[in-house]
Amino acid sequence: MIRRWLTISKSGKKKKAVNDTITEEVEKVDFKPVNHDINDELCYSESSDNPSSSLFVSNLDTKETFLNEDNNLQISSGLDYSSETCNQGSNYSQDGIFYISNAKAINAYGGIITQGPEAPILAMKVSDSMPYGDGSNKVFGYENFGNTCYCNSVLQCLYNLSSLRENILQFPKKSRESDQPRKKEMRGKKPRIFTEASFEKSIAGTNGHLPNPKPQSVDDGKPTPVNSVNSNTAGPSEKKSKFFKSFSAKHVQDNNKKEGSPAILTTGKPSSRPQDAPPLIVETPNEPGAPSRLSFENVTDRPPDVPRKIIVGRVLNYENPSRGSSNSNNLDLKGESNSSLSTPLDKKDTRRSSSSSQISPEHRKKSALIRGPVLNIDHSLNGSDKATLYSSLRDIFECITENTYLTGVVSPSSFVDVLKRENVLFNTTMHQDAHEFFNFLLNELSEYIERENKKIAASDINSDSEPSKSKNFISDLFQGTLTNQIKCLTCDNITSRDEPFLDFPIEVQGDEETDIQEILKSYHQREMLNGSNKFYCDECCGLQEAERLVGLKQLPDTLTLHLKRFKYSEKQNCNIKLFNNIHYPLTLNVCSSINSKVCQKYELAGIVVHMGGGPQHGHYVSLCKHEKFGWLLFDDETVEAVKEETVLEFTGESPNMATAYVLFYKAMYSNAVEKNDRENMAKEQDDNIDNLIKYDDWLRTCNSGQKKKEELPIADDLDTAIDDSFVSNTPIKSSKKKSRMFSFRKS
C-alpha cells in the first residue's frame, strides 16, 4: 500500500514579465493522518477516464476546488506522501506534483476531497491533540453484558455531546514521546469472533428457542465467569414482557395507514424469532470452542419495532465468513469483493435487504455483532497507570474515533469492570439506575480532572515554563448554581447560600401533569418555614418564621434534567414508578426569577428512556441528536434513525410505559432555525445517513479484498506445510476452530 503525506497547493497564475514562466502561489494547509486504511489496488474505477479519486484530507474549513488549468488536481509535497486514495492511472512523485488526469470537478469539504457535490460524511475536526479527528462521523452501538443497558444509554448521550467528546479526547495532553499508534482495530487481549455457524449449534440444543448466554471470558483456555451479571431484570420474564407494550398502539395504526412509513418504537403483541433469522454465537480464535461473553434480552421481551433506517444492525445478503480466520469480525458481502467501485457515493445502495425493516430487533443485534467490527476493549490502554473511569471512557472514545470503519459495536468490558471496582453498588445483579450512574460518573470524571490539573500545576512550578491555566471542563459544561435565600420575617435579614448542581431535578407531584417549560421559564421555589420547621436567625438569636426562596444563579452549558419518576410508596412498601405526564420541548427557555440576566435558550440533545413498569426491572435506551445524522435511537448494539416528532412521545401517557428519564439540553448561542431550514436540515441528515451507509459498505469492501489478498501467502505456506507432513508422515494439527455450546440463562 502506498502511503503519502499530502499538502495541497492552490494554483494561481502570476506573470512577472513577458518571457517569464508562470510561478505558483502556494497556500499550504496542515494535514493529519487520514481516517481510513485502504489499499489502492483494491478500489478502482472501470474506466481510466473517470478515476475513482477520493482523497481524504483534513483541516479544510471551507469548500474549495483544487483544479489547475489542465483540469488536474494539484497537490504539492515537500516530505513524505500519506494519502488514503483509491484511484487508477495516477502519477506519484515524491518531489513533484500529484495529478489526477481528466478528473471531474473535485470539491474539498472541510477535510474531504470527493468527486461531485456529495455530503462531507468523512470530514472531521483535526488538530494536534486529535490527529485522527473528533469522531463526529462515527456511529457505534454498545454490547450489553446482561444488565449494562443503563451504562450504554448514558455513554451514548455523552459521546454525542460534541464539546464533551472533544475535551475527553484532548485531555490530558499526550507527550510526543508517548505517541501511540492508531487504533485501527481493537481485538482485545482475548479476541472474539461472532459467527453464524456456531450459533446454529447452540440453537439445536435449545429446541429452537433463542438462548441467553451466561457472560464468560477465556483465560488460559478455561472458561471463567466474568464480573458481569445475567439480567437487567429482577423478576420473571412474563412480568417484563408487559412493559414492552409501552410503545403506543396509536403509532402502529398511524403507520399502517401509510405504506412505506413504518413505525418507530411501536409494539403490539411480542412475536417470536423469525424462522429464517440466522443465529449467532461467539468463538474465541485463541482457544478453540472456549465461550465468551454475549448477552441478549429474551426475544419475547423485545418490541417488534419497525425502524425507518437501520445504521448499525443492518441485515445484508452475506456469505458465511471463513471459519478459520481470526482477523476480522466482518462479513464478506456477495458480489462486492470483485466488483469495480468508483467513489462510494457513485454506487447505489443495493445491498440493503428490502425486508430489513421487518427483521426483529434480536436479529439486528446479532447482525451487528456478526458484521462488526466489535471493538473489544477488555483492558486498559493507558499504559502502566491504573485504569480509572476517565481513562476507560477515553479509551472507548479513542477506539471509536480511530477505528477504520464508520459503524460497528463497542464491547466496553474494561469500563464496566472498572465501574464495578470503583462502586460496589453497580457490582450486583440488580437492575441499576441510569441517573445514579450518570451522577457518579460525572463526579468521578471531575475528580480525575482536578487531580491531573494539580499534577500539571506542580510540574509547571518545577519547570521554567509558564504555568498553564487549569480548568475543569466537566464543571464548565455541566455545573450550574442554585442560590438559596432565607428571609427572616421578623428582622428582614436575608441569608444566602449557593449550591452547585450537575443535574437539575424535576419533581413529580401526585397525579398532576408537569410542563418543564412552565417550570423553568421563570424558575423559583418558595417555602414558608414555620411551626416545627422555623429558621434560626443569627440577628434575632432565636427561631423565627422565615421564607425560603430558591432560584437559579448560574446556568450550565449543558443542562441535564432528572425526571424523578421513581418514588418510595409507603402503601406498597417499595419503590414504584410514576407515570405522570411530563411534557418536554425541543427548545427550552430557562430564566431565573432572582436575576433577570440569567436566561438561556437550550435545544434538546439527548434522552435516556426507561422502558418498564417499575424501578426494579426494565430496559434503557437513548435517543441522541447527532450533529450530522439527526435523531438516532441507540438500543445497545443497534442504532437506527428516528423522526424528530418521535422524540417527544416519551411523556408517560398511558398505556405507554417507555418514559423519558434523563434529558440533556445544549445551550443555543445562535438564532432560531426557521421551519424551512429545519426541513432542509432533515433532508440533508437523511442524505448523510444514506451516504454514511454507502461509505461504510465501501470501506468494508476495500478492506475485505485487502485482507483476502494478505491471507493468500498464509494459505500457500499452509499448503506447503501439509505437503511436507505427508512426506514425513508427521501429523499436523488442524487450524480450524471448534465451536462449543455454552450455557445460557434466561433474562
Curated annotation (Swiss-Prot):
Compositionally biased region (Polar residues): 225-235, 319-343
Organism this protein belongs to: Saccharomyces cerevisiae (strain ATCC 204508 / S288c) (Baker's yeast)
EC code(s) of this entry: 3.4.19.12
Keywords: Hydrolase, Phosphoprotein, Protease, Thiol protease, Ubl conjugation pathway
Entry keyword Acyltransferase: no
Phosphoserine: residues carrying this PTM: S198
Family designation: Belongs to the peptidase C19 family.
UniProt biased composition (Basic and acidic residues): 174-183, 251-260
Catalytic activity of the protein: Thiol-dependent hydrolysis of ester, thioester, amide, peptide and isopeptide bonds formed by the C-terminal Gly of ubiquitin (a 76-residue protein attached to proteins as an intracellular targeting signal)
Gene field: UBP13
Residue intervals of the USP domain: 140-668
Further remark: Present with 125 molecules/cell in log phase SD medium.
GO cellular component, one term: nucleus
Protein's recorded name: Ubiquitin carboxyl-terminal hydrolase 13
GO molecular function: cysteine-type deubiquitinase activity
UniProt region (Disordered), positions on chain: 172-305, 318-367
Active site residues according to the UniProt entry: C149, H619
Biological processes, Gene Ontology terms: free ubiquitin chain depolymerization; protein deubiquitination; proteolysis; regulation of protein stability
